[in-house]
């Protein structure tokens, strides 16, 4: 997921994407615990995507305060 794509999304879309990624991370952790996870690097990528989303949401929040 590219940051430029995320910056073009609305806050509602970003929050929906964040919710989807959090549920995906939960499922990946569950699969890891049960030994069914095929690609453990996916957990790292999802965590980084969540961090990117939160960063952009915070940037948008600060833009609104300053405006």
Swiss-Prot record:
CDD domains, alphabetized: Ribosomal_L29_HIP (cd00427)
One GO BP: translation
Pfam families listed in its UniProt record: Ribosomal_L29 (PF00831)
GO cellular component: cytosolic large ribosomal subunit
Lineage top rank: taxon: Bacteria
Keyword Repeat assigned: no
SUPFAM superfamilies: Ribosomal protein L29 (L29p)
GO molecular function annotation: structural constituent of ribosome
Keywords tagged on the record: Ribonucleoprotein, Ribosomal protein
UniProt keyword annotation of Ribosomal protein present: yes
PANTHER family xrefs: 60S RIBOSOMAL PROTEIN L35/50S RIBOSOMAL PROTEIN L29 (PTHR10916), LARGE RIBOSOMAL SUBUNIT PROTEIN UL29C (PTHR10916:SF0)
Family: Belongs to the universal ribosomal protein uL29 family.
Protein name: Large ribosomal subunit protein uL29
Protein source organism: Alkaliphilus metalliredigens (strain QYMF)
Designated gene of the protein: rpmC
